[in-house]
C-alpha cells in the first residue's frame, strides 16, 4: 500500500489538542491599555452565518450565545439565566437575562433574541445539524423553542457560536466588513481578512470590567514566525504555538505560558469512495495508526489520542468507550489479508483484490505545522503494514 502526502488543501489530524498561549509576565502592554495578539487566521467575512466564521467572532470577545461552556467543559448560563425542557424533549424554554445591552447601547430584548436566532436559521445551512425547529415563541422574558424532533441537548446546541445573538434592529447590509453588533466585551472597529482586525471595549458590557481599550488581532500564519514576533515585541500575546516553540519560553520569567485542554478535536476524514470505499481498507488504515506515539512523542504531549467525535474534555463517557480500531498493526495486516489484499508484485506493498496498486493521498493544510508531522508519521506507519 503506497502513500502520497500532498501539502495544503483539506482536512486534518488528531484529537483533543492542547491550546497554548504565551503572554508577557507583566500586565502592562505597549501603547497604554492596548494589546496585540498573534493569531493563526481570522475570517474571510464577519457574516456569522457564513461557514464557521462565527467561531472567531465569539473567540475574540464579540459574540455571545444563550449558553456557553466554561473552562472545565461544563454547560453554564450566558445570555440566558436558566432553562427547562419538556419530558418529551421537544419544548425548551430559556429565560433571557435582563439588563443586557448590545455594544451600540440598544437593549437586548427577548424579541431581538428571537429575531437573531431566526436570522441564523434562515441564512445558515448548518442549523439542521443541531436541531429541527417548528417555531419560537416569546412570553415576557422567556423564549420557547418548539421542536419537530426531540433534542436532549438543546442547551448545548445553543452554545455553538453559530447561534450568537446580534442586533437585528439596525442596518446590517455591510455586516461582512463591519461585523455584527453583539453583547460581548468587545466590538469590531476595523476588519482586514488578511491583516489586522481591531476590536474595542464594549462600553455597555454586562458582565464585569473589560481589561483593554482595544485589541489588535494580527494574522501570523506560521507558528515559528508568531513565536519570533512575541520575542521581538511585535505582538503581546502568541496564540497556538507549537510545543517546540513553547519550550523556547519555558523557564523565562518574562513570559507566562497558559495552556488549557481544548474542547476541540482535529480530524482526518476518509473519502469513502475509490480505494477507501472498501471498509476493510479503512479499518486497516485506522488500526495501523499509532496515535499514542504521535501525541506523546512527536507532539510532546500536546494532544490526546482520539477515538470518538467528541474530545475527552467533554463529559460524554469518553473513557468508557471501546475503540474497535485501536492501534494493532498485526490486526491491520490480518484485515487486509482476509479481504483479499496481497503483495502480488513483491514490492512490499499489497495490491487490492483485483490486483491494482493501492495509493492513498493524505491532504492537509499547512498553517498548523503539527498536521504535516502527523501526516508523515501516518505515512511511515502505513508503510509498516504494507
How should these model regions be labeled?
Residues 81-123:
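Aromatic- and charge-enriched surface segment that lines or borders ligand/interaction sites
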Residues 202-248, 379-380, 386:
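Ligand-site clamp/hinge motif
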Amino acid at each position: 500500500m503506497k502513500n502520497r502526502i500532498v501539502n495544503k488543501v483539506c482536512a486534518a489530524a488528531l484529537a483533543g489538542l492542547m491550546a497554548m498561549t504565551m503572554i508577557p509576565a507583566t500586565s502592562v502592554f505597549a501603547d497604554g491599555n492596548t494589546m496585540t495578539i498573534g493569531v493563526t487566521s481570522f475570517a474571510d467575512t464577519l457574516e456569522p452565518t457564513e461557514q464557521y466564521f462565527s467561531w472567531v467572532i465569539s473567540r475574540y470577545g464579540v459574540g455571545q450565545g444563550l449558553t456557553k461552556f466554561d473552562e472545565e467543559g461544563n454547560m453554564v448560563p450566558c445570555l440566558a439565566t436558566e432553562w427547562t425542557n419538556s419530558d418529551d424533549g421537544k419544548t425548551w424554554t430559556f429565560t433571557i437575562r435582563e439588563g443586557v445591552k448590545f455594544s451600540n447601547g440598544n437593549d437586548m430584548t427577548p424579541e431581538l433574541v428571537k429575531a437573531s436566532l431566526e436570522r441564523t436559521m434562515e441564512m445558515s445551512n448548518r442549523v439542521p445539524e443541531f436541531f429541527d425547529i417548528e417555531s419560537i415563541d416569546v412570553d415576557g422574558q422567556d423564549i420557547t423553542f418548539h421542536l419537530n424532533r426531540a433534542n436532549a441537548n438543546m442547551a448545548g446546541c445553543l452554545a455553538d457560536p453559530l447561534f450568537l445573538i446580534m442586533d437585528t434592529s439596525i442596518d446590517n447590509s455591510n455586516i461582512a466588513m463591519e461585523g455584527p453588533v453583539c453583547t460581548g466585551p468587545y466590538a469590531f472597529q476595523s476588519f482586514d481578512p488578511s491583516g489586522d482586525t481591531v476590536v474595542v471595549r464594549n462600553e455597555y458590557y454586562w458582565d464585569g470590567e473589560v481589561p483593554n481599550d482595544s485589541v489588535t488581532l494580527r494574522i501570523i500564519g506560521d507558528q515559528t514566525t508568531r513565536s519570533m514576533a512575541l520575542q521581538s515585541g511585535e505582538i503581546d500575546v502568541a496564540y497556538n504555538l507549537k510545543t517546540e516553540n513553547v519550550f523556547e519560553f519555558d523557564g523565562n520569567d518574562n513570559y507566562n505560558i497558559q495552556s488549557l485542554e481544548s474542547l476541540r478535536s482535529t480530524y482526518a476524514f476518509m473519502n469513502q469512495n475509490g480505494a477507501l470505499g472498501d471498509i476493510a481498507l479503512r479499518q486497516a488504515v485506522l488500526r495501523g495508526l499509532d496515535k499514542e506515539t504521535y501525541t506523546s512523542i512527536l507532539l510532546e504531549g500536546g494532544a490526546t489520542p482520539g477515538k470518538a467525535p467528541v474530545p475527552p474534555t467533554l463529559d460524554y463517557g469518553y473513557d468508557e468507550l471501546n475503540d474497535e480500531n485501536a492501534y494493532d498493526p498485526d490486526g491491520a495486516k490480518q484485515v487486509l489479508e482476509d479481504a483479499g489484499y496481497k503483495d502480488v508484485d513483491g514490492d512490499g506493498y499489497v495490491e487490492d483484490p483485483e490486483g491494482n496498486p493501492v495509493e492513498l493521498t493524505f491532504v492537509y493544510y499547512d498553517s498548523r505545522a503539527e498536521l504535516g508531522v502527523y501526516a508523515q508519521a501516518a505515512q511511515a506507519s502505513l508503510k509498516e503494514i504494507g
